[in-house]
Amino acid sequence: MAYLLALDQGTSSSRSIVFDEEGRVVALAQRELPQIYPRPGWVEHDPMEIWRGQLATARQALASVGLAAWDIRAMGITNQRETTVLWNRRTGQPVHHAIVWQDRRAESTCAQLREQGHEALIQAKTGLLIDAYFSGTKLKWLLDNVAGVRAQAERGELAFGTIDSWLIWQLTGGTVHATDVSNASRTMLFNVRTNQWDAELLDLLGIPASLMPEVKPSSAHYGEVRPELLGHAIPIGGVAGDQQSALFGQACFRAGMAKNTYGTGCFLLMHTGAQFQASKNGLLTTSAAQTTAQTEFALEGSVFVGGAVVQWLRDGLHAIQGSAEVEALAQSVPDSGGVMMVPAFTGLGAPYWKPEARGTITGLTRGTTMAHIARAALESIAYQSAALLLAMSRDAVAAGAAPLAELRVDGGASSNDLLMQFQADLLGIPVIRPAVTETTALGAAWLAGLSSGVYGSTDELSSLWRAERTFLPTLSTGRAAELMAQWEHAVRQTVLA
């Protein structure tokens, strides 16, 4: 039996998962990651804490089932995207805390870029909109605001990377400075059409090219783990950003296949194949995980408040004691009783892009109970995801492709049967929950397995993917359209409020 080790470095925790060659979870270890908030709107992580925690979980996962490093055929890495690290090449020490993807300190730089008319250029090259979310302006902030850093960078003494690059550097003892296309595509510095760092964009942001890691396919050889770290050298064979890794772990290998990850927010990606497809509906174009030098793309949209609305019911309204109670409370009523909740607590993301929107609850009557509000809260997750998916389908049809035939789902909230059934009802297509829900880590393991010869092709991986449950739509298309029209009316009210 071949085993694969996936390092899954996320925003709130570092995890290591061992899979067997059938894609089953053999061992899992997790360590929480402290969050650092120096100022309002700023979010940081300690890169050394990330490294120490990730290494500790790898050791713990192996030890928990009596495996040794020589039992592992290959390692895959998946990571929180956009989070930015800058470190000294000689010492391997970071020059500053990592600036996390949620951090908004670079908004003024983004505003300047928009005012200077650079949005069309950046979108054409990167597939992204100008936003502080992405790594490029975070890196510029470090160069401009940390004493002595720009001079060191211009002397070639520093290295930049997203979290995957940082872990690869540490795992290989500083012998490999690399990233994969999916992570590179989230920096706002990478030309997704040419698969190269873009000299014009680097110059625009004043970033020395010497900082940048080598870009490889997602399934490739990234060096070997130093033997003294885990007891034996392990080849690093797969790397992908978390959402692209989840798309791969859901076996969405062909154009037109899509997955939605239901977490604190929701992340929806649809594979679009080898064609760069610019969205006309407020979505981002991003690189999908690549198993060869052939470029692969995906459309991506994010819902800012997904499962977080359940946390708000618990912590803000004190409507429930624990998040697990929400499904039973929502099921105690047949529907939301006309109540519609739009949880625009931090504005609305794709496809609306309305940062000024604020949350609303409409349709309240004397007969409204907390159960109706709980149901409306759950349904809001499905409405937002449906709006995203309908936008993706419009883009697909405009490009001559077929509309989406099914949606594969993962993430914590995908275990909620009521939510998944309502999602299928709104979309009018099957919603499929996989047997293995650790799809992000599984994607990294599969990428490593391909490059190390455990698997021969993505067709072989497709045969390993298994559904746990399929939710079929029960509403007529007319009724689903009525509900979506009511949702869109409620969304318009969030901007008027």
Curated annotation (Swiss-Prot):
Pathway the protein acts in: Polyol metabolism; glycerol degradation via glycerol kinase pathway; sn-glycerol 3-phosphate from glycerol: step 1/1
Binding-site positions, glycerol: R81, E82, Y133, D242, Q243
Listed GO biological process terms: glycerol catabolic process; glycerol metabolic process; glycerol-3-phosphate metabolic process
Regulation: Inhibited by fructose 1,6-bisphosphate (FBP).
Keywords in alphabetical order: ATP-binding, Glycerol metabolism, Kinase, Nucleotide-binding, Transferase
Catalytic activity: glycerol + ATP = sn-glycerol 3-phosphate + ADP + H(+)
GO molecular function, one term: ATP binding
GO cellular component: cytosol
Superkingdom of origin: Bacteria
Keyword Cell membrane among record annotations: no
InterPro entries: ATPase_NBD, Carb_kinase_FGGY, Carb_kinase_FGGY_CS, FGGY_C, FGGY_N, Glycerol_kin
Residues the record lists as binding ATP: T11, S12, S13, T264, G307, Q311, G412
Keyword field contains Ligase: no
Residues reported to bind ADP: T11, R15, T264, G307, G412, N416
Binding site for sn-glycerol 3-phosphate: T11, R81, E82, Y133, D242
Family: Belongs to the FGGY kinase family.
Cited PANTHER family: GLYCEROL KINASE, SUGAR KINASE
Record-given protein name: Glycerol kinase
